[in-house]
């Protein structure tokens, strides 16, 4: 929706959408006009950097934003997930399936070494059987996910397992984005009762 909204602000044909490295390699400045780029604020920082490198190499005169246009919350969360995922048996991103930020965070966790990473958009899909066999679990959320969803997820785990929460701070900000590592062991309580 963000890209569609931006493209709709200008006359048809005045903006070209480049969605991946292959499209960046094939892009043609048909009319030889001055060109510039902007990026969707919730894209993967790493993926965006590669596309930008390709465009800059092909079009040295290309204009770019005066400052980083990836949302700082997105950048910081991706950096935190990247840093922590390699230590985890499982990684959960709490967020919506239609949130590109949340979906990208799952991709970042997988690329960073935690293959068993997944998006949790509903209590009904929490994989408790897999969690009970894990020692270290990473948790983060999409930028627009309310903190209460993360708290509810952790509460659900506490009801089934004995856990230790270790909040990891990667970057000091005025706005806090908590990333948790959970150390699990089976809870003596009946998970149903």
Where do the model's predicted regions map?
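Single conserved hydrophobic/aromatic residue that forms the stacking wall/gate
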Residues: 183-193
